[in-house]
A protein has these predicted regions:
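C-terminal low-complexity, glycine/proline- and small-hydrophobic-enriched intrinsically disordered tails
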Residues: 616, 745-958
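N-terminal, positively charged nucleic-acid-binding surface of large information/translation enzymes
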Residues: 1-242, 283-296, 300-318, 343, ...
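Core structural elements
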Residues: 123-133, 371, 620-633, 653-663, ...
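Acidic, turn-prone loop/beta-hairpin segments
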Residues: 83, 180, 186-192, 441, ...
């Protein structure tokens, strides 16, 4: 018995328990031993995370695919797990220690701190997993993995050691994104570009051999910079090769102000003649672009900042080399000054000596750490790197060969551009939480990389005995007693970038490096669903690692979904206060409503503009389905044993059979093509418009009539269509559909494991004989009902039934549309004249007379050779239907009203056009505001077109 009111919270809680207790989501079910596998690996959320709208979209789409393929009979593995999230987790635990006034990380030491992190993970690390379950994610939760669990850690170490042995992992001194607060290198993804209202300082660099005078432009070259504090590390001035202003100076030198360093003027394409003075200072140790210029011209790299962002000048040999004697005093004065304080002091000193030409306001993007909030420094430091260029080549070739494809396809271009210009990947982080790098150092700095400490120590001691640094006896003692080798062999303290372990996720979660049965069955995976923002950080690296270590692509399809924005199209951010919490929406509207909203709006390549009104609308859709199932139940709709939907006699029932087949095909093809919005739209239209609005409405005369066989057939057909709807809708709205499946009949299995609708066929006599002969309300619906032929069978189709019922639907719809356009009150009945129609249409008009009158608010239906005067004419399937409105409404007043509406629409269009033609508005307004104005224009044009159509009808009637 279906409850009167739809209560999502109660249903979701109950169905979650049912699924978990039944093991419905488990891969490797015995009955699917011979089924084709279908594998998706979840993009592992941070263990510190809480569900945000990006997670909700990403996991809804994955779940749609998994539930769809599971219902199609495949052995589905949706592999869940979480990422250890190095910086994020370490910060959470450090903050907790501070709040509890406990010893800091450094005070307690590495071992004890890591114990605390594992303790935190055990207590709080499951939050996001439970939230994903609330969303309805049908992962095989029994296989949950963590990027630092024992098996995955073994895979990480093996990969590092093998890549190092192959020369693909190495140590190098390069620029990295350095966080001066967290004191670690961070990835590009952890850098936020923030628009800052700053300044552009124009500095005078004296030309060597000329007497410097601020009043003599020939004695200096002007460079423009946003970072005057880094000028202390300048090693060149660059000008464009084609800039005639400076062509005579290329090859000469300038003297660096305040410092006295002699640096060359070089010609380089990076310099922009149109920007600033056209000459730029080159600081290879403090700017990524300058680093590349420095490599092209063989310039020294002089770092003038320390890890905390303070000037480091005293004792800095690179800085002091070649400077005049007086430079040491300056170095002592500025040494240890914080970078932004140093900026002010250096600018003041430059001004004092006449080296400051001018200062201009300058709004520009400045990199900030997304977790620390401080300005990030390009910092020259020794780090571990992966030779990404070598690993990228097979990954590019695989996509070009079609082994892996992107959906939408345009993302392939982005992938190729990045992969073909890929830089070395910095994989070391100055943290404690993470996979510690398996490298050990001897007393002379020689590196020993090995899978275990024992192996590294053995290799190191053997080497130093051979080099006669230690005696064989000392080597033996050190091997036996760790205390004796303390300080002689030390492990690298750094940990690996979190993305390093994530890059192995598709195969490490299945047991690699062991050849496990799971690895053989479920790898390569089928589809990766992910956001475009991690195409480089994760997707590309999984491709590289998967191909290198398994010789196979990790997935055949990569579906890139777009962003979820607010209803105006703005990116969600805490600072804007426009973040929508998916769990709040789940609490208020139910998980099914949120899931359906996200699917319905997930058009390929288009960002989602999410509004609570849309979610509320799909909550109403769920209620509509609930009430339709209650209607079916109250009218005795039930599947009887042996019912064959292809053998129904009633035209209406054959029509709904035809429409159900079309809907099933449309939904199936759309999901297969990753057109989630089209699939959701198709099932929505079928449920709301076809089933609820038309079929249910049109069955009422049959259900209330005296024709027993027709009534019995219709009840069974309603139940059959209801079940097909529950199947089609299940991937999108799993909770409500599973609940309705459970309460509408006695079943022998869950909907989540029921077969997906395909092409219905009649049951054989033998199959019918095996069915229960109990009454319709007590019948156990066996799995054979709703079983399907393979795709070679001809699809059910009934053009005659479609022509008959489709005519009724089109006629009533057209009349309702005109009544709405003309403001005809619902209480006013209008006559209908079918004009010069065929005998077939005349017969239809007579057969459906009562239904059409009731649904279209008609006084009567008549037939004539010509349309009466004052009638609005409608074209219904190529024939004319006329609505005489003379005397029903004031035609002149209605015409005036419509003309007024057109004028209003024109005014709206004119107002928007004025905005969009204003170059200042388009250039300065936020992108989402401009987009909103364009949408307003489209809506006004559409509204105007409809009013013009109505006005044209009215003119003809007049």
């Amino acid at each position: 018995m279906i409850e009167k009111n739809y209560q999502p919270a109660d249903i979701e809680s109950r169905m979650s328990r049912v699924w978990e207790e039944s093991g419905a989501f488990k891969a490797g079910r015995p009955e699917r031993r011979d089924a084709a596998p279908f594998t998706i690996v979840i993009p592992p959320p941070n263990v510190t995370g809480s569900l945000h709208m990006g997670h909700a979209l990403n996991n809804t789409l994955q779940d749609i695919l998994c539930r769809f393929e599971r219902m199609r009979g495949r052995d589905v593995l949706w592999q869940p797990g979480t990422d250890h999230a190095g910086i994020a987790t370490q910060m959470v635990v450090e903050r907790q220690l501070m709040e509890r006034q406990e010893p800091s990380r450094r005070e307690m030491g590495r071992a004890k701190f890591l114990e605390r992190v594992w303790q935190w993970k055990a207590e709080s690390g499951g939050t996001i997993i439970n939230q994903l379950k609330r969303l309805g994610a049908s992962c095989d939760w029994s296989r949950e993995r963590f990027t630092m669990d024992e098996g995955l850690s073994r895979a990480v170490v093996k990969v590092f050691v093998e890549l190092h042995r192959e020369g693909l992992i190495y140590k190098d001194k390069r620029l990295v994104n350095w966080d001066p607060k967290l004191l670690t290198a961070i990835s590009d993804l952890e850098v936020q570009q923030v628009e800052v209202k700053g300044h552009l300082w124009y500095l005078r660099y004296p030309i060597e051999g000329r007497a410097f005078s601020p009043d003599d432009p020939a004695s200096f070259i002007v460079v423009a910079t946003t970072r005057p504090e880094t000028m202390l590390g300048d090693t060149a001035v660059a000008v464009h090769p084609d800039d005639e202003r400076y062509s005579a100076l290329v090859g000469s030198h300038v003297i660096l102000p305040l410092v006295g360093r002699r640096i060359p003027i070089v010609a380089d394409d990076y310099s922009d003649p149109e920007k600033g003075s056209g000459a730029v200072k080159v600081t290879p140790a403090h700017d990524f672009n300058d680093f590349e210029i420095g490599k092209r011209h063989g310039l020294p790299q002089i770092s003038v900042l320390d890890q905390e962002g303070k000037l480091s000048l005293v004792g800095n040999e690179d800085y002091l080399r070649g400077l005049p004697e007086g430079a040491l005093q300056f170095a002592e004065e500025f040494h240890g000054v914080e970078r932004f304080a140093a900026r002010k002091q250096i600018v003041a000193r430059l001004e004092d000596f006449g080296f400051l030409e001018k200062i201009e306001p300058n709004t520009h993007m400045v990199p900030h750490g997304d977790r620390s909030g401080v300005v990030i420094e390009p910092f020259l430091t020794d780090q571990w790197y992966v030779d990404a260029k070598t690993l990228a080549q097979p990954a590019v070739a695989a996509v070009r060969a079609g082994e892996t494809s992107f959906v939408p396809k345009n993302w392939e271009k982005t992938y190729f551009e990045w992969m073909e210009n890929i830089q070395p990947w910095c994989i070391s982080r100055q943290l404690w939480w993470g996979h510690q790098i398996p490298a050990w150092y001897g007393p002379d700095g020689k590196v020993f990389v090995a899978e275990t400490e024992e192996e590294a120590v053995g290799n190191a001691l053997g080497y130093y005995v051979e080099q006669e640094v230690i005696t064989p006896e000392q080597g033996h003692d050190m091997a036996e007693d760790p205390a004796k080798r303390e300080g002689f062999i030390t492990r690298d303290e750094d940990v690996l970038d979190t993305w390093f372990s994530s890059a192995l996720w598709p195969f490490s979660t299945l047991g690699w490096p062991d050849e496990t049965p799971e690895l053989q069955r479920y790898y390569p995976t089928d589809t990766l669903v992910t956001g475009f923002d991690i195409i480089f950080f994760w997707v590309a690296r999984m491709m590289m690692m998967g191909l290198h270590f398994t010789k196979e692509v990790p997935f055949s399809t990569i579906y890139m979904h777009a962003l979820v924005r607010d209803e105006k199209g703005a990116k969600m951010s805490k600072s804007k206060g426009n973040v929508i919490d998916p769990l709040h929406l789940v609490d208020e509207y139910g998980a099914d409503a949120l899931r359906f909203t996200l699917a319905a709006m997930a058009a390929q390549g288009r960002d989602i503009k999410l509004s609570t009104q849309r979610v509320d609308g799909y909550r109403s859709f769920a209620t509509k389905l609930w009430n339709a199932c209650r209607f079916a139940e109250m009218n005795g709709a039930a599947l009887t044993a042996g019912f064959d939907p292809t053998s129904v006699k009633e035209t209406l029932n054959r029509w709904i059979m035809h429409e159900t087949t079309l809907a099933a095909r449309e939904v199936t093809e759309a999901i297969e093509a990753y057109r989630f919005n089209d699939a959701a739209g198709a099932v929505y239209r079928f449920v709301w418009n076809v089933f609820c609005d038309w079929y249910v409405e049109l069955t009422k005369p049959l259900l209330m009539g005296e024709d027993g066989p027709a009534k019995t057939e219709t009840r069974a057909m309603i139940a059959w269509v209801r079940d097909e709807i529950l199947k089609l809708l299940h991937p999108f709205m799993p909770f409500i559909t599973e609940e309705l499946w459970d309460v509408t009949a006695k079943r022998d299995g869950l909907l989540v494991l029921a077969p997906w609708p395909r092409k219905p066929r009649a049951l054989t006599p033998e199959q019918i004989a095996t069915l229960s002969l109990a009454g319709p309300t007590d019948a156990l619906i066996p799995p054979v009902i709703g079983t399907f032929e393979d795709d070679t069978e001809e699809e059910f189709s009934d053009p005659e039934a479609e022509a008959e019922i489709g005519w009724v639907v089109d006629l009533v719809s057209a009349i309702r549309s005109v009544r709405a356009e003309m403001n005809i009150p619902p209480s006013t009945l209008t006559p209908l004249v079918l004009v010069d129609v065929s005998d077939e249409t005349k017969a239809r008009g007579q057969r459906w007379n009562d239904v059409a009158k009731r649904l279209a608010r008609l006084a009567d239906i008549s037939f004539a050779d010509a349309a009466p005067e004052g009638a609005v004419q409608l074209l219904v399937r190529g024939e004319v239907a006329a609505l005489p409105l003379k005397g029903v409404i004031d035609l002149a007043a209605e015409r005036a009203r419509l003309e007024k509406e057109i004028a209003k629409a024109d005014a709206d269009i004119k107002r928007v056009d004025a905005k969009l033609s204003n170059e200042k508005f388009v250039a300065n307004a936020p992108e989402e505001i401009v987009e909103e104005e364009k949408e307003k224009r489209e809506a006004a044009l559409e509204r105007k077109a409809k009013i013009l159509e109505a006005l044209e009808r009215l003119k003809k009637a007049s």
